[in-house]
Amino acid sequence: MTKSPSRLAEMRFQMTALSAQLRWGTNLELEPVRRREGELLVCGMGGSGISGDFLQAVAAAEGRRTTVHKHYGLPGWAPSLRPSVVAVSYSGNTAETLSSWEEARKLGLQVTAITSGGELAEMAALAGEQLVVIPRGYQPRSALGFGLSALLRVAAQAGAISDPQPSLEEAAHLADSLSGPKGEGIGFASELASAMGGRMVGVYGSVPLTQVAAYRWKTQTNENAKRSAFWSVLPETTHNEIVGWDLPQGLARRRVGIVALRDRDEHPGVSRRFEVLEKLTADRVTWVGEVWTQGFSPLGRLISLVAMGDLFSLELARNSGADPMAVDLIDRLKEEMHTSADSAPEEPSGF
């Protein structure tokens, strides 16, 4: 792989749009829908599916529940509990999400589509179901703000969460201040990436909030930096995974770097576990650094970590000369799936 400043600059430009994308959602006008029944079920894969994970965390902070489905069809309980379904696919051609849409329609469930076009938009329009069209022209993983803000607005309309407008505004401000053109997080992300070096990236989050951001960091590292990475969640990690760092001759310390994502409202027990875990494993694995949430609302705090993780992944790409735009193996997998199984064509960029 060769270093491509223009490709890196293009992805960097797309990432700086996070703030504007979130603000786009505050001005979104939604079509009225009939009264929804049951809990909200979000169906989507990759970057679309992760918007459901963010919604789930925001709803949980309000004492409410939503469910995310990242598979073909619908969960086995859907026919009896009859959820309201939101199908999210940036391209509108994601095979698993189209399968979920078709199953929901067969069951006569209330369905909303969030997409930039493709088959999903066509089916929603033909069926007369609620359709939220988001702007095209982005790499799907750099269009999180569009899908997430639209999903939050739909969820609020359904009564699954409270009005997200204030938290969207806060999140947009944080995204701009951290990862905008003059973002204050750029220098720290560069230092973090340099400290990581060529190690495998491990990202530790915690229940209930930063675990979602940890997964985003992991997937952005995979796609932008072309780097193997993993994520894990406290407190569960301290009951199993940590034993795996007890390798001979400092093997893990040389090859693995851990970034801890911390939140000011994390459980005191989790805070203590982070401290003790680092103390006990400091000679076994490299703790590269901590990144703390900023902001007040659950959404704002999550977006602050998203902004930093996006910057971190791009700095890793810069340091190694990786092309952050390409996802060749994903493209090849989808071509093989389409050729061998007569499946719907999917978007070429991962979700």
Task: Please place each PLM-identified region on the residue numbering.
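Polybasic, low-complexity association/targeting segments
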Residues: M1-R7
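Active-site phosphate/pyrophosphate-binding segments
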Residues: R7-A9, F13-Q14, A20, W24-V33, ...
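Short, hydrophobic/amphipathic alpha-helical patches that form generic packing surfaces
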Residues: Q21-W24, A150-V154, V212, E223, ...
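Glycine-rich phosphate-binding loops that contact phosphosugars or nucleotide phosphates
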Residues: R35-L178, D263-E266, S271-V285
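A generic structural motif
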Residues: H69-Y72, R227-T238, W287-F296
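Short, surface-exposed amphipathic charged segments that create phosphate/polyanion-binding patches used
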Residues: S84, G145-L152, T219, I242-P248, ...
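C-terminal active-site/capping subdomain that shapes the small-molecule cofactor and substrate pocket
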Residues: G244-D328
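Short, small/acidic-rich helices and loops at N termini and domain boundaries
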Residues: D323-F351
